[in-house]
């Protein structure tokens, strides 16, 4: 995060005197900085924290200390990153005051025109960034996005055809017996995803997670010798399991995936291909993963967080083919109680940033640095997982 030339220590000193009394850091910064050297990012950051410090100086102090920590330490946690001050500014505003259940032009509350514009802009930016038919930008976290995607698939492939069979469209009109039968169908579908201990995520069918309670969940693993995905073995298992959803993507697998091959497997076993790209979405947006390594070209539904490699606010999105758009848009109220308008605004800003040449350069450097780190580790005698 670039907020000017001040060091974290100098920034902290703007807020508190030695006796702990809260100062006016914005006034201090502006009075001590020549006009031509005033940094607008610094002004925005300090102005925000000045207001926080007026009410909760301890919280302002903790925020500045976290800034100090992030500036002084190299983070090697794969799921963490740094979002821009532009993104942070978009998130800290009065949009948080607005309820907006539903989706653009289909809200439960009135006066949502501005939120509609924000959400529509974020969705259009996401569609352009990833080259997809539809984007749903409401989910608050990757786990939420996965559950929205799961239920969208269940709605499209199980619920809607079942209702059509009995000539009904409204769930409220079902008899108790019809409702029980539908619930049984929805709760007995199969999911095939990457095993948790092979690098899959909790939400990919791990038994301690709700995903394994929603589905009859099965897992494929990496090859025990190479540590790599064995696509032929996955295909064989998929043909045996016949899952409704074939889930690709990972939380801790350090290689690119051949999504074209997964598409072939899904088509052969009759499954919907879903991809969770939360940990590498930035490499897709940055044009590092292209062709068969770009899940957006092959999957029916793709989910991702917006932080991690996307460098946006903490949140998530669901991307899909037009076939699933209507079902995905039912995420609220099916799964979500409502969107966070201020976070959707920040997502829009982050997506705009990710469409720049500078972002693509950064994304390619991520891969280059990872490869150099791997080489150096090998030269030092370390055994890499793959």
Predicted feature residues:
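N-terminal glycine-rich, Lys/His-bearing helix-loop that initiates the first secondary-structure elements
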Residues: 19-121, 264
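Conserved PLP-enzyme active-site core in the AAT-like
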Residues: 121-383
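Aromatic (phenylalanine/tyrosine) cluster motif
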Residues: 15-16
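Conserved PLP-binding catalytic core of the aspartate aminotransferase-like
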Residues: 11, 383-386
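A signal for specific C-terminal beta-sheet/loop modules enriched in small/flexible residues
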Residues: 1, 23, 91, 210-215
């Amino acid at each position: 995060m670039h907020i000017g030339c001040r060091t974290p220590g100098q920034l902290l000193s703007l807020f508190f005197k030695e006796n702990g009394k809260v100062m006016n850091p914005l006034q201090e910064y502006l009075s001590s900085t020549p006009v031509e050297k005033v940094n607008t990012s610094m002004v925005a950051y300090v102005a925000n924290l000045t207001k926080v410090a007026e009410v909760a100086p301890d919280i302002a102090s903790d925020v500045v200390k976290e800034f100090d920590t992030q500036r002084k330490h190299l983070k090697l946690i794969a799921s963490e990153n740094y979002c821009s001050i532009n993104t942070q500014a978009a998130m800290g505003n009065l949009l948080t005051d607005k309820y907006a259940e539903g989706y653009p032009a289909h809200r439960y509350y009135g006066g949502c025109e501005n939120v509609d514009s924000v959400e529509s802009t974020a969705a259009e930016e996401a569609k352009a960034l990833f080259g997809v038919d539809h984007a749903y930008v409401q989910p608050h976290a990757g786990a939420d996005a996965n559950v929205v995607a799961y239920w969208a698939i269940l709605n499209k492939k199980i619920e809607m055809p079942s209702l059509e069979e009995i000539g009904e469209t409204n769930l409220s009109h079902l008899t108790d017996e019809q409702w029980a039968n539908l619930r049984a169908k929805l709760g007995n579908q199969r999911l095939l995803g990457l095993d948790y201990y092979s690098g899959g995520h909790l939400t990919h069918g791990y038994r301690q997670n709700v995903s394994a309670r929603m589905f009859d969940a099965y897992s494929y693993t990496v090859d025990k010798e190479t540590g790599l995905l064995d696509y032929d073995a996955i295909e064989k298992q998929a043909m045996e399991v016949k899952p409704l959803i074939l889930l690709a993507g990972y939380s801790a697998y350090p290689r690119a995936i051949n999504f074209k091959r997964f598409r072939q497997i899904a088509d052969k076993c009759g499954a919907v291909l879903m991809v969770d790209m939360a940990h590498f979405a930035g490499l897709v947006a940055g044009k590092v993963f292209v062709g068969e390594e770009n899940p957006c070209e092959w999957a029916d539904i793709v989910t991702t967080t917006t932080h991690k490699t996307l460098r946006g606010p903490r949140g998530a999105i669901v991307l899909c083919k037009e076939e699933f758009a209507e079902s995905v848009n039912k995420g609220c109220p099916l799964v979500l109680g409502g969107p966070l308008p201020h976070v959707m605004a920040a997502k829009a800003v982050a997506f705009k940033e990710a469409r720049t040449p500078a972002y693509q350069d950064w994304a390619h450097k991520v891969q280059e640095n990872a490869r150099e780190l791997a080489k150096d580790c090998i030269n030092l005698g370390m055994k890499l997982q793959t």
